[in-house]
């Protein structure tokens, strides 16, 4: 809830990358609330804040925000609170991107990063290595594509673009 306190620091940033939040297997109500707040609503606040900074920016350099959502937008996850929160931020990012007008698109770029299961502290059973995933993100980052998809699941590459096409 204190995202706006970072505004003066974010003005110096050209590319803001929002990655993971929390992954808690507890089925208590407070866990669902925390997951939605941290994994979705906080990221959406940062998205809106950074957009505001970008649109007021006088520099010729476009500001970019890259937001890691998840395959949980289209596929079930082992953790319901994670699935709900990641699906929500995915929908909010799509909503925001689809409603950027032409002038805003000249100053502000939104990229959605969709990662399949990679090995991390949050996911010790992930099948992709962090090194592989980071290299693929780096390789795809300079493309003009809105979606940066890295997954061992071929359905993700098929379903995500179709889903995005029909959003809003």
What name fits each language-model region?
Residues 112, 118-167:
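C-terminal helical subdomain
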């Amino acid at each position: 809830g204190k995202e706006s306190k970072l505004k003066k620091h974010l003005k110096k940033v050209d590319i803001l990358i929002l990655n993971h939040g929390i992954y808690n297997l507890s089925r208590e109500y407070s866990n669902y609330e925390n997951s939605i707040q941290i994994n979705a609503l906080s990221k959406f606040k940062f998205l809106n804040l950074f957009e505001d900074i970008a649109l007021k920016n006088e520099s010729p350099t476009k500001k970019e925000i890259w937001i890691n959502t998840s395959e949980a937008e289209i596929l079930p996850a082992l953790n319901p609170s994670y699935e709900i929160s990641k699906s929500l931020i995915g929908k909010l990012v799509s909503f925001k991107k689809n409603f950027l007008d032409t002038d805003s698109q000249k100053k502000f770029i939104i990229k959605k990063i969709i990662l399949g299961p990679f090995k991390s502290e949050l996911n010790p059973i992930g099948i992709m290595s962090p090194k592989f995933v980071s290299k693929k993100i780096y390789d795809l980052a300079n493309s003009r594509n809105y979606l940066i998809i890295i997954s061992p699941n071929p359905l993700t590459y098929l379903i995500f673009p179709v889903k995005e096409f029909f959003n809003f």
